[in-house]
Amino acid sequence: MDTAGPPAPAGTEGDGPGGSTGETSRRLSKEQIFVLVSAASMNLGCMMTYSILGPFFPKEAEKKGASNTTIGMIFGCYALFELLASLVFGKYLVHIGAKFMFIAGMFVSGGVTILFGVLDQLPEGPIFIAMCFLVRIVDAIGFGAAITASSSILAKAFPNNVATVMGSLEVFSGLGLVAGPPLGGLLYQSFGYEVPFIFLGCIVLLMIPLNLCILPSYESDAGKQSFWKLVTLPKIGLIAFVIISLSSCFGFLDPTLSLFVMKKFSLSTGYVGLVFLGLSLSYAISSPLFGLLSDKMPNLRKWFLVFGNLITAGCYMLLGPIPLLHIKSQLWLLVLVLVINGVSAGMSIIPTFPEMLSCAYANGFEDGISTLGLVSGLFGAMWSVGAFMGPILGGFLCEKIGFEWAAAIQGLWTLLSGVAMALFYLWEDSTMRRSKAQNILGTEEEQAALLPNDT
C-alpha cells in the first residue's frame, strides 16, 4: 500500500470507538455521537467568534488610527500565536489531557471574545492597538488548544473515517463562518460595536457545560516520536506547504475584502457580510462530499489536492480581477469567484489531514493519541502560519499596489503548491512502479533458482 492510502489498517487495531469493525462506521455509538456534538459545537461557536470581525472591525480600527498594515497584523497575530499554541499543545496533549484542553480552550476563547467587545471604550492610537493585539493573542491560544484537542479526539474516535468526519464537521465551521459576518454586521448596525462580541462570547461560554457532561476522556501513554521527525518527511513537508498556501488565501481576505467591496461597490456593512457568505457557504456544503470521497476512494485525494490548489489560484486571479486580463470588476463576478473558491478550498483542504496521518503511520509512527496529537498540532500550526502571513501580506500589498494585484500575487502561492504536489505524486507513482517491477523480477529469479534443472 502506498503512503497515500487510508489509515484504516492502523486504526482497526486501535482501542478507540469505531476502530473495531466496519459495522461501527455504519452505526454510531453513543460515545461517538457525543464526540460529534462536542466538536460541532466548538467548530460553530469558535468560528463565529473568529469571523465576526470581517465586516466592521477594519472600519472601526481605521477610526482608531490603525493603518491597513496594522489591521492586517491584528488579524495575523491571531494565527501566529495559534501556531505556537498548536505546536506546544500537540506535543503535550497526552500530559494535559484532551478533554481538559478542549474545555479550557473554549473557556478562554469565549471570555476574551467578550473582552474584545469593550475595546472601543479605549482611546485611539497605541493603547487601542496594543489591547487589540493582546486580546487576539490570548484568544488564539485558547482556540489553538481547543482545535488541537478536537482533531485528536475525532481521529481517535473515528480512525477509519477521518476525512468523512472532518469534512462533515466542516459544515459547522462553514456555518460559523457563514453566520458570523452577517450576524456581526447586523448586530453592529443595530446595537453598535460591543453587542456582537458579547453575544457570541456568551454563546461559546454556554456551550462549555454541555461539553463537560458529554465529551468522553481518552487516555494514552506518551509517544516517543517528535515533531521534527514528522515534519522532515518529504510528503508531510509538501502537504504542510499546501496547508500554508490555502490558509494564507483565507487570511488574505479578512482585512482586505470588506474594504475593497465597500469602496468598489459602495455596499453597507450588512451587505458586505453577505458577500463573505458565498465563500463560507460553498465551502461548508462541499466539504462533507470531498471528505466522503476521500475516505471511500483514497486514490482521489492526490487529485483533489492538486486540482483544488490550481482552481484556487485561478480564483484569486479573477477576484480583482488582475488588470492584465482586462476584465471589468463586477459584484456578481466577485461573488461567483468566491463560491468557486469555497468549493476548491474544500477539495484541497479536507484530504490533507488523512494524507498526513496515513503518511505518519506508513513511516513508523505508532497508532495512538500521541501521534494524533502530533499530526493535529502540525496541521494547526501550518494552518496558522498561512493565517498569519495572509492578512499581513494582504494588508501590506493592498496598501502598496491595490487589491487586484495583491489578490493575484496571493494566488501564486496555491499555484506553486499545486504544481509541487503534482510533481511529487508523479515521482511517487514512478518510484512505486519501479519498486513493484523489481520485486516481481526478484521473485521470478528466486522461483527459477528453486526449480529443478531439466538438462
Swiss-Prot record:
Protein name stated in the entry: MFS-type transporter SLC18B1
Gene: Slc18b1
Subcellular location: Cytoplasmic vesicle, Secretory vesicle membrane; Cytoplasmic vesicle, Secretory vesicle, Synaptic vesicle membrane
Keyword GTP-binding: no
Domain of life: Eukaryota
Region (Disordered): 1-26
Keyword Lipoprotein tagged: no
Native source organism of the sequence: Rattus norvegicus
Catalytic activity: spermine(in) + n H(+)(out) = spermine(out) + n H(+)(in); spermidine(in) + n H(+)(out) = spermidine(out) + n H(+)(in); serotonin(in) + n H(+)(out) = serotonin(out) + n H(+)(in)
N-acetylmethionine: modified positions: M1
Membrane topology: Multi-pass membrane protein
Known tissue expression: Expressed in brain structures, particularly in hippocampus, cortex, and cerebellum (at protein level). Expressed in astrocytes and hippocampal neurons (at protein level). Expressed in peritoneal mast cells.
Chief place of localization: membrane
